[in-house]
Amino acid sequence: GEVKSPGLTQLKAGPLNAIRSGEYWLRGTVRTGPLSGEVLLASYSPTLTQQEFVGNHYQWHHQPETDGDAAFKNTSTQQFTGRLSQRLPGFADHLFEASASAVNLLNYVYYDQNGLPAQLTSSKQLLIGFARHRVRFGRFGFDNQATYTKGAENNSEALRIPALVTESRAYYQSYIFGKAMFTQVGLEFYYQSRFRGYDYSPSTQQFYLKDNFTIRNYGVASAFFVADIKAVTVFLKVPYLNQGLNGAGYFASPYYPAYPRRFQFGI
């Protein structure tokens, strides 16, 4: 297990009080064969921007020592996760991974429909399922994964994310030039289901809830090439190959279109 907590002085003065009023991060894990379980308990204070902001269009004061808006409490999280990681029999190299998580959020801080920080007075529960399958046939490989989340739907208060997100990758990899350079070339595809996305406030540089704009479900296909030459890695990518096949584009957030098809290069 792992423990991250307030300073030693605070813990020595009163361990239980330090955990109740301070920040902490506790994680315990147990494993048996391909199965494992994890418990995560955490408490953290709101960000400085969530507590205090003064600008031309917005201002708020949620810090305990200031006279103004009600002070925010720490957000606490309890997460329980079960995992499976198993190599599958067959003529190829298969690895299957799956997990299921139950999450409870208390005093969650978010930005409401007016762009102002707010804190949930009730707890919020999430159920998260995840699955991933990786397989290699010689130099060919496939990597597919999907995440499903329940509890953050379109009408959900405070937190909204796509219910389904999937990622798939197919690639070919090998050494060339007498094993002087390792290369990988392939295609990848990203998909997410429709949801009511967050609008963006340039004044506060924060994303906030938006009720009247639904980001449709969309998929983005990309081609990539990676080359490793000793300590140097060269990366080439063309995102959104399928632009124009099912619409001219898509929105990353309300009224903010995502980048069109382009060429990316990195070293």
Where in the sequence are the language-model features?
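Exposed, low-structure sequence patches enriched in small/polar residues
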Residues: 1-267
